[in-house]
Amino acid sequence: GFFSLIKGVAKIATKGLAKNLGKMGLDLVGCKISKEC
């Protein structure tokens, strides 16, 4: 029902957020290694 729909959207949102945070983390590590911050 409605609640499961919200749970599904929340799950997708968390996945997207985790992916974005992971990408940002990788970018930060890469810039620290190459000293191009």
From Swiss-Prot:
GO biological process assignments: defense response to Gram-negative bacterium; defense response to Gram-positive bacterium; histamine secretion by mast cell; positive regulation of mast cell degranulation
Compartments, record wording: Secreted
Cellular component, GO, one term: extracellular region
InterPro entries in alphabetical order: Antimicrobial_frog_2 (IPR012521)
Disulfide bond entries: C31-C37
Keywords annotated in UniProt: Amphibian defense peptide, Antibiotic, Antimicrobial, Disulfide bond, Inflammatory response, Mast cell degranulation, Secreted
Record bears the keyword DNA damage: no
Disulfide bond listed as a keyword: yes
Pfam family, one: Antimicrobial_2
Superkingdom per UniProt: Eukaryota
Known tissue expression: Expressed by the skin glands.
Sequence similarity: Belongs to the frog skin active peptide (FSAP) family. Esculentin subfamily.
Function: Mast cell degranulating peptide. Causes histamine release from rat peritoneal mast cells in vitro. Has antibacterial activity against the Gram-negative bacterium E.coli K12 and Gram-positive bacterium M.luteus NCT C2665.
UniProt name for this protein: Esculentin-2SE
Organism: Lithobates sevosus
Organism lineage: Eukaryota, Metazoa, Chordata, Craniata, Vertebrata
